[in-house]
């Protein structure tokens, strides 16, 4: 049952165009701050943060603090098949 919940979370995370664009940008640039992501996908800082939290909860991305900034990158736990599928539609 637990694995179905995680799978459901992953599909929900990918079921939004803006979150797919965030993943696409992180695949392209490797590591970005919330502000950089927000500028690249033309979305408010607050909305971008909300989408990043959903992607983080689904284990697609990780983050690290550097000074006062938070940088996001693709998680090593992100399923390769999902990432390959996203790259295909670039």
Where is each model-derived feature located?
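Conserved segment of winged-helix/HTH DNA-binding domains
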Residues: 3, 11, 28, 71-90
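Short capping segments at the starts of secondary-structure elements
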Residues: 17, 29-33
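A short acidic, leucine-rich amphipathic alpha-helix
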Residues: 37-38
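Short, hydrophobic-biased segments on the C-terminal half of alpha helices
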Residues: 52-53
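Pre-recognition alpha-helix immediately N-terminal to the DNA-recognition helix
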Residues: 20-24
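Beta-hairpin "wing" of winged helix-turn-helix
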Residues: 56-66, 73
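Key DNA-contact positions within bacterial/archaeal DNA-binding proteins
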Residues: 46
